[in-house]
Amino acid sequence: MSAWSQLPLFEPPADDWTFSGAQTHSLTHCYHDYPAQMIPQIAAKLIARFAPRPARLLDPYCGTGTSLVEGLIRGHEVHGTDLNPLARLISRAKLTPLPLAALDTACDDLEAWLRAPIGQPQKLPRGINLTFWFQPAVIERLAHIRAWLDQLSDDGLRAFFAVAFSETVRECSNARTDEFKLYRLPQKRLAQHTPDVFGTLRAKLRRNRAGLCEFLAAYASAPRQSRAYLHAFDSVKGIPASSIAPESVQIVITSPPYGDSHTTVAYGQFSRLSAEWLDLPDAARTDRALMGGVPLKDLPSFNVPALDSALQTIYAQCPKRALQVAAFYADLRASIANVAQVVARGGIACYVIGNRKVCGVLLPTDRAVQHFFETVNFEHVVTYQRAIPNKRMPQRNSPSNRVGVTDETMTREAILVMRKR
């Protein structure tokens, strides 16, 4: 272990990374809500500090593309991958400089379609209990919109409208929208739940068109009009050279999952209803495919004393839970080793990390990530600390997986910066 790893991780007091009160939904960042999104100001500041000139940027857990958008409007060639098909769809829409004339023509066509008589639904989701999650009138109107979407042949237009449709599905469903996991509204609230499907869609489209206008202006003023590349590879298993060549990336900016989907953010459950309506692949298996989705059989040692001690403490309380947590760190370590291979010498890796609790035990993810990078020839540059005033997270969660047992969620994040030797 290097001398760097023994030093306290701190931030210069005057260097504020909290961005309290900042506008986080500018440009195409307004397109779609998503759990635990990194705010664009963090990515923008990291790019300005560590990659001010156009280069190649990678986000190996890109989610809805926050860092990719910020890189693209600064002239970077951006690459992102994510295992959640809905996240990739949202990213694709946010990164597409769609011509406004084509969009407005399509919007006029959609408006005419919405005003036309609603026919018999031709295609309905089969992977969910439809009448449990949606009222009959909502199903009818969503199917009407979906039929129009199926007529679109342009990939960029289809992504734009599909993203607005996705949020409409979620907001007009019987699911609680204040939860990441899939819970039905209580009966009392259901009785008062009369969503306006077409009105909701129109509002999303107006908002997203305004965001697109901002994005197009920023993209046009970039040092160069670069390209965005979205991939579907699993960085835990490897990064194909055909997608990203070894030692070709100058900067990595990412916010990996806080932990496995069992008790942290269940991205698959959050996406499930939209994914079914959009007929996205593997909608029911997303959470299991993410890091830590498959528990280990034995508790390993990670050679990070604080992490190993925390896992042993959790194991003494709940062996199953400890093995789930350990699986996440094993996958994270493998992913970092693969990411390291595509970073050029002197390249920078910036990881925005939250240290969560499981069974009341604080897990030192920042220390673990630093150690994992040090074992693949990176050195620690700095770690900035920030409060979390504006990331969409629940105030309390159930880190023990026991009903009624809750704990406070993370209120701070570490921004770990490493450099490849």
How should each PLM-predicted stretch be described?
Residues 258-338:
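SAM-dependent methyltransferase catalytic-core segment centered on the flexible catalytic loop
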Residues 1-53:
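S-adenosyl-L-methionine
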Residues 344, 399-421:
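Core SAM-dependent methyltransferase catalytic element
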Residues 139-254, 259-265:
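SAM-dependent nucleic-acid methyltransferase catalytic core
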Residues 43, 57-74, 78-85, 91, ...:
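Conserved proline-anchored active-site loop of SAM-dependent methyltransferases
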Residues 85-152, 270-300:
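Conserved phosphoryl-transfer catalytic core
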Residues 335-345, 376:
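Conserved helix-to-beta-strand junction in the class I
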Residues 378-389:
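Conserved S-adenosyl-L-methionine
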